[in-house]
């Protein structure tokens, strides 16, 4: 992952607007590819095909149990994978669920691009 321009990041987001925000924030570092609707098998297959080391998983109150299970399952299958949760930064329960599931960090939707890019740079150095 020394060539940051060739990085591919996977994302499971609430909607296309969130995906576009993430793509814009990470455009200087690589490309963000949608990982579909949240199927573990689909996510793991995409990780294998794209060699992505970092996955963004959107969390919301309605689906937090399934989304947390997805994070846990992905990390169980791919322990070296880094997962960053996305969600409402004001919702402490989402943040707690993300951390308990094994996410490395939590990013609030709409955060400044520089914050997101800085986080990804730091995480990429550890991968």
Q: What is the predicted role of each segment?
A:
Residues 111-119:
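C-terminal output helix
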Residues 2-26, 35, 55-56:
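Conserved acidic segment of CheY-like receiver
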Residues 42-43, 53-74:
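Conserved phosphotransfer microenvironments
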Residues 31-39:
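Short hydrophobic/Thr-rich beta-strand motif most characteristic of the beta2 strand and flanking loop
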Residues 75, 96-100:
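Alpha4-beta5-alpha5 "output face"
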Residues 121-127:
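The C-terminal output helix
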Residues 80-90:
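A short, hydrophobic beta-strand element within the central beta-sheet of small alpha/beta folds
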